[in-house]
């Protein structure tokens, strides 16, 4: 999958990148996102962040009968560095900071770490990561439904059609399927 995505020209495309200067309360750079309502008061900096895309959820559960996980796979290729970067960079901060999104703590960093940038795509408790997980699970469900429909249609046209039982919902169709289930993929 990594090589396919790279061949499609997705290497180097960020999920989002933003750089905020805390002292002058300005978004210095915004790529594939929008930063608004920047405030810096009472040792708290806050802002609104709207990304135009979601991070890729790196699944930690083996799927499709494999022993490995997507997390294992991304350790073998530079996927996170090339295609899953959602960088939050905040400069002109001193001290240690607790970072929250929608009231949920996502981590603690010092001003130096925040000035280098934090890849939010690596943090699984962010709302945007959780949203992308939901989409991933919905897509897997869609895929399973599509598979069942394809199998049903294949059975209708490959097995039942030449027997004159296309879309037959009767005992004759059931008997035909039972009679040949050992010799076919039914």
Predicted features by range, described:
Residues 2-186:
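Conserved catalytic region of serine esterases and O-acyltransferases that act on ester linkages
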């Amino acid at each position: 999958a990594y090589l396919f995505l790279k061949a499609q020209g997705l290497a180097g495309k960020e999920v989002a990148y933003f750089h905020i200067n805390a002292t002058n309360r300005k978004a210095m750079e915004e790529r594939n996102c929008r930063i608004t309502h920047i405030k810096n008061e009472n040792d708290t900096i806050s802002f609104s962040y709207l990304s135009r895309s979601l991070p890729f959820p790196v699944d930690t559960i083996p799927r499709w009968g494999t022993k490995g996980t997507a997390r294992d796979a991304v350790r073998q290729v530079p996927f996170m560095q090339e295609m899953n970067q959602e960088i939050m960079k905040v400069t002109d901060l001193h001290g240690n900071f607790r970072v929250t999104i929608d009231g949920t703590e996502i981590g603690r960093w010092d001003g130096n770490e925040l000035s280098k940038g934090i890849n939010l795509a690596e943090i699984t408790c962010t709302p945007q990561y959780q949203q992308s997980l939901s989409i991933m699970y919905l897509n897997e469900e869609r895929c399973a439904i599509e598979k069942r429909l394809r199998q049903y249609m294949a059975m209708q046209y490959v097995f039942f059609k030449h027997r004159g039982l296309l879309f037959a919902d009767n005992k004759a169709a059931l008997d035909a399927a039972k009679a040949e289930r050992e010799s076919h993929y039914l």
